[in-house]
Amino acid sequence: MVLNEEQWIKELREKRIAYGISQGRLAVASGITREYLNKIESGKMKPSKELLETLHKELARFNPEAPLTMLFDYVKIRFPTLDIQHIIKDILKLNINYMLHEDYGHYSYTEHYSLGDIFIYTSADEEKGVLLELKGRGCRQFESYLLAQQRSWYDFLMDALVDGGVMKRIDLAINDHTGILDIPELAEKCRKREYIGKSRSYKFYQSGELIKHREDDREYMGRTLYLGSLKSDVYFCIYEKDYEQYVKLGTPLEEANIINRFEIRLRNERAYYAVRDLLTYYDAEQTAFSIINQYVRFVDEEPDKRKNDWKLNDRWAWFIGNNRQSLKLTTKPEPYTLERTLRWVQRQVAPTLKMLKKIDKGNGTDYMETIEQQAKLTEKHKMIIKQQTTPAKDLVES
């Protein structure tokens, strides 16, 4: 629903009061005087559309409901064993009888088991052992099984380490729900050298550029900023998540639940130390922002001072924790669905099926019935049917 200007101003005032924010504080954050804001709220002054959007955007930063959430977004662990059944049953605590087995793998592994987007690779090579890989969807699906097992990520990671698991990659994703970060602004600060970090390397890509060949969802990602070398064991990826939701799902940008995403990508020893820190303090915010603060900070230029003494940028200071609600590790359990298959059918197959149905109806033919009768289900299809029709509680080991 599109609000008119009067409704926007009424909503602005109501939210400001509900958040406990004074006119002066919001005015300063928005770059105007308190008197000017007072005239806007009382209807004596008509703001520009741009100013009204700025006021709403700045007010969103003061939302007492956590403006930031954090999730695991990628987990890759190698186990020094060839006993894949042990890893599935005792570490993942999943029922192997419901897993799809296929005689091929990635990363030079020769076979794998899968349950939705949860992949476990193995081979006859003892040095390679067993490899668990959970990408974004895999993490969300695994959380639904952790929930059924009454376990947490902390419990699982502890079990993995105790069993000798070697952390190969861990990604922590910080979701910005209110637009605290401004990616083009951060990119401009990198260009102007208002960016202090262990690595000066950065890359900024506009939406739609031929970019990010390593990214699975590269065609969906909006404007994207990489901080640090992509070859290093620590780097950051910041991108417009609302654009991704718009391209993937058609969600209007103004209705997107997540505006930006800040991903901390850790490999090998860096991933291990992050997990160790998580399991020592059980404080995901401390772990995440200690890594960020160690590697990067954005500042505002002060010509009369040394660069290391430049003032921390206000927006960046807010993001890393100044005067905002604390951040906790959250979960977003999602069941394994046929979303990608259904999207493919809808895009590639449905128009042809609809055409055949209309031809059958008009000519009295039975093309559709014949096609369905002749279709043969493979063992893979049968296992997917089994996975899709079994409740989560039956897919886990008790």
Where are these regions (language model features)?
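Short, basic-rich loop-to-helix N-cap that marks the start of a DNA-contacting helix
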Residues: 43-57
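Structured, helix-rich domain cores that form ligand/interaction pockets
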Residues: 2-7, 14, 18, 57-336, ...
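Short alpha-helical DNA-recognition segment
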Residues: 20-38
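Positions in alpha-helical segments
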Residues: 10, 14, 35-38
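Residues in the recognition helix of alpha-helical DNA-binding motifs
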Residues: 15, 29, 40, 341, ...
